[in-house]
């Protein structure tokens, strides 16, 4: 009997059927690909080399992470039926954790889906609502798997350390993720919407990103291979700006016909005077602001483009004219020794730090009367 679209249950049952049909139940085809590589050493070597090249070209640095991912590929080739794994990318904001995860997807030519956990406090976002509830939906895990349509894929959970506990109770999200990362249990993941249906997730690469591992549940952390994504050095940032950010922004803005020259010294000047970060987000915004300003001048034929120039060499004066005063204010502190005061160093999980004065003084004690 056909159910009409005006029936209250129509769209709920349609959602149920669509997700069941679109879910990647079998990995036979994907396993066969790696089985063929196992039988041919030359093809296997070419495949690994191709993946390695793609990783190098798509993101700068992160050698430890790339090495770990190549090891997983090696395992898939040696044992095509092998399971996925769980990675934790820990590091300050802006150091390229999400970019790295996406570049892995592109290098392996497998689907990628992102689930943001920041601010979430209910497990329903991951394992859905009970089917009998009005307006119930599957959780994000099954939704994303059905969208990707392949059992070998990447599920990327962003901001793991910012997932909230619910009213002081056991954190539902953490409990679900502990089950998800257990290799003995994740071949039978259950979503509340599908009441008793076991979904295999054992071929999936689970990737988690977080800034502070001390905020992550210890049981969950024990099941994750943690990879430290370190803050960029100034030389790292310079290479990223010259080889990745500048070409990307020029293409995005449509500035390809203009030759923009920026020296390492100028990039370093912008970094040290207009940004305070471990990553490259703010420096990218500053470079973008410079290019957008120059692009508008080019269109209006004013400023540096009053004479229809085809080449621009960025200087400190141009930077100051566009970005105005630097945000960094370098001051000398404690020019002479002072009794009871020393300088200490501080560091934040955001990758920044500095000098902080530490002072020792004595308070009168009410207990002794002194």
Cite the ranges covered by each PLM segment.
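Pre-Walker A (Motif I) flank of P-loop NTPase domains
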Residues: 81-87, 151-153, 204
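Conserved C-terminal "switch" segment of AAA+ ATPases
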Residues: 149, 212-222, 226-285, 296-308
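AAA+/SF3 P-loop NTPase mechanochemical coupling elements
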Residues: 148-152, 189-209, 258-262, 314
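Extended, charged alpha-helical coiled-coil/arm scaffolds that mediate oligomerization and mechanical coupling
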Residues: 1-78
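Walker A/P-loop
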Residues: 82-117, 146-147, 178
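Conserved catalytic/switch belt of AAA+ P-loop NTPases
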Residues: 157-199, 222
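C-terminal engagement/docking regions of AAA+ P-loop ATPases
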Residues: 281, 285-370
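AAA+/P-loop NTPase substrate/partner-engagement loops
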Residues: 107-137, 144, 236
